[in-house]
Amino acid sequence: MDEMLMITNYSDFLLRSILKKKVARDACLLPWALALLMVSACAAEKVTPSLLEIRPQHEKEWEANPRDVANVLNATAQELWIYFPQRKLPPINVVPKGGPITLFERGPNGEIQIKLNTGKTFWAQYAYQFSHELCHALCDCKPHENPNHWFEESLCETASLFTLRKMAGTWNTAPPYPNWKDYSKSLNAYADERIKLGKLPAGTSFPRWFADNERDMRLNSVDRARNNIVAGVLLPLFEADPKMWEAVTYLNTEKLTKLYSLKQYFEAWSRNSEPRHRAFIASVTKQFDE
């Protein structure tokens, strides 16, 4: 940070010095000084995400090389975590069996506890399940009576699709190991298969489909067929503006009762979010309007 401040201060001094001199004499230096200011400003604005500590547990149950397991889980998490520059999370304990689920209860030292249902070298399945559960942690999931919880489930399904597609691109150029480059195809294929499951019935618009299905989703939030369809609508929004993943931080800020409508739910989300997120939340809300 001190180096950034030194660069910025020097750039300011240089620009002031140039402007005090005759324009004709120093015109050749002015573009250079302006460019330096722009670079230093960008450097000052850049925020490095805090470290995310992921702890694979029950080593033998993974039936895979522990180092490989850790690499896959960390690679998965980073595709989302980079969009939370101000966020901090406690360590995350991950076990391969008993889920997939993110427990409301924390570990003995406040750790987030995630259970998957995977193992061996099914890396695409690791990524799919872990990114979904990590999204619940990022949404600050907690015990609730919220009948709109289906939206969080759909949002976390969106996170899985987003992560798989991002990882495929990353691994195609910078895999954890050089010989893992071809796994990028498996990641893409896994995402494509899930996206196909989320296709709307022919001739049906999403608002019409939602009007016909909302009641059932309020009664059963974990309905993967319906969650997939909602995720298919949300995915293009997040891929167009991935910085907006940060907005899920505020999804559960307000304690909601079982009487909340979807409109009230979105209003609470927007109200508790940062101003920079509200236009995006409005665009999400609009998808559900007839």
Segments from the language model and where they lie:
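Pan-zinc metallopeptidase signature
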Residues: 199-290
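Auxiliary, metal-adjacent structural segments of Zn-dependent hydrolase domains
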Residues: 52-121
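Active-site recognition of the HExxH zinc-binding catalytic motif
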Residues: 128-144, 157
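Short pre-active-site segment immediately N-terminal to the catalytic Zn-binding motif
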Residues: 114-129, 143-147
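N-terminal secretory signal peptides that target proteins for export/translocation
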Residues: 1-24
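Bacterial N-terminal signal peptides
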Residues: 29-39
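Bacterial Sec-dependent signal peptides at the C-terminal "C-region" and cleavage site
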Residues: 39-47
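Post-HExxH zinc-binding segment in Zn-dependent metallohydrolases
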Residues: 149-195
